[in-house]
Swiss-Prot record:
Keyword Nucleus: no
Alphabetical GO biological process terms: translation
Recorded family membership: Belongs to the bacterial ribosomal protein bL12 family.
GO CC aspect terms: cytosolic large ribosomal subunit
One Pfam family it belongs to: Ribosomal_L12
Source taxon at top rank: Bacteria
UniProt keywords, alphabetically: Ribonucleoprotein, Ribosomal protein
Biological role: Forms part of the ribosomal stalk which helps the ribosome interact with GTP-bound translation factors. Is thus essential for accurate translation.
Identification of the protein by name: Large ribosomal subunit protein bL12
MF GO annotations: mRNA binding; structural constituent of ribosome
Assembly description: Homodimer. Part of the ribosomal stalk of the 50S ribosomal subunit. Forms a multimeric L10(L12)X complex, where L10 forms an elongated spine to which 2 to 4 L12 dimers bind in a sequential fashion. Binds GTP-bound translation factors.
Amino acid sequence: MEEITMALNIENIIAEIKEASILELNDLVKAIEEEFGVTAAAPVAAAADGAADAGAAKDSFDVELTSAGDKKVGVIKVVREITGEGLKEAKAIVDGAPSVIKEGVAAAEAEEIKAKLEEAGASVTLK
């Protein structure tokens, strides 16, 4: 008996909602939000939300030289300084752009490396 009564109540509620105006429905939503402490905001897609969380929690980065720019010699010098490689190896890294210069670098160090390379004229991305 209780199941039948509950079903009738739900059907009545739905029928009332169908006949309500937009303003009445808006007031209903606000009242429900206040009463139950919830929000009617649409949830963000789970995949996008997970990607945002992964990006926020990332604590190590790969520094990638995407382009040497016009000042190639200056960029080679900075790459040598950062990697400790010789002139030939540093030139090969710069000529082979896009290429990863350093992997698994802490966020602060990655930003520092990026700033040095950009100051020398290179384009850099952190991954």
